[in-house]
Amino acid sequence: MEPGPALEHIPVMLEQALELLACRRGGVYVDGTVGGGGYSEAILRASAPDGILLGVDWDAEAIGRAAGRLSAYGRRAILTKAGFAELPEVLPRHGFAQVDGIVLDLGVSAFQIDDAARGFSFTKDGPLDMRMDPGLPQTAADMVNTLPEKDLADLIFRLGEERWSRRIARAVVERRRERPFQRTLELADTVAATVPATRDSRRIHPATRTFLALRLAVNQELESLERFLSGALDLLKTGGRLCVVSFHSLEDRMVKGQFKEWAKSCRCPREAVLCRCEGRPLVRLLTRKAVRPDEREKERNPRSRSARLRAVEKQGVPA
């Protein structure tokens, strides 16, 4: 989501997501990652004149921005500060048992990246924070300054898929013995000085994967996604649709794996002699493989380059 000169928030693959979501008038839809409100506003337009949009985000600043953007839609737009993993509790509070569609645009927003004070950027100096919700107990600085070297290396390797994780962790521990990390550029410069120059490093910043790993850990993003997916179908009406835009392989593998499991024609245990589930899949795959942004969108919006969109439709399940 590449910002323009005034911190413009550009939703990734908006047209494709809307087509897959198939909004209709009078429907109830959830934007589980409100961000700048781009998906939310598009859904409200597509479900006019009486569709309802429930938007959640655990970043209070995002909710505030979206409230201003969506004010013209009045009661059709309902916004609340919460994470998408909390939707099973949030929906009943607003009088909804199930909804017609849910969209998630995972990861960090343009506003969060471009606000140096939030601590997500490895190119702008700011406090080493990375919390999407400032109420979370642990910052990236806390992790960098306290994790044992092996644990830090494992985290960077597992969540950032960084091949140089051990070398980076060793350099971080040596540097923090002199003084603790407090600023984003302190960490970014340490990583950049540690990672060998490769063809890949000319394309992406050397600290990209380390910052990704820390952000995922600080915000427990994969845990939130797993928790959401475990109960997502219960939130949808029959025929309801779930669209997920992910930005890195760990998220996409989780979404792809869960969608594939739901789409199985038989869900009985392997040891079962006879099929008792009647061979009916829980969902219909709307995307056989991930939808990717076209070259025009990637040029207009560089942050869309790694995006993958997957979608399913909930099927009727026999009693």
Swiss-Prot record:
Residues 292-302 have a biased composition (Basic and acidic residues). One of its GO terms (cellular component) is cytoplasm. SUPFAM superfamilies: Putative methyltransferase TM0872, insert domain, S-adenosyl-L-methionine-dependent methyltransferases. It is an enzyme of class 2 (transferase). Gene3D superfamilies: Putative methyltransferase TM0872, insert domain, Vaccinia Virus protein VP39. It is found in: Cytoplasm. GO terms for molecular function: rRNA (cytosine-N4-)-methyltransferase activity. This is Ribosomal RNA small subunit methyltransferase H. It comes from Syntrophobacter fumaroxidans (strain DSM 10017 / MPOB).
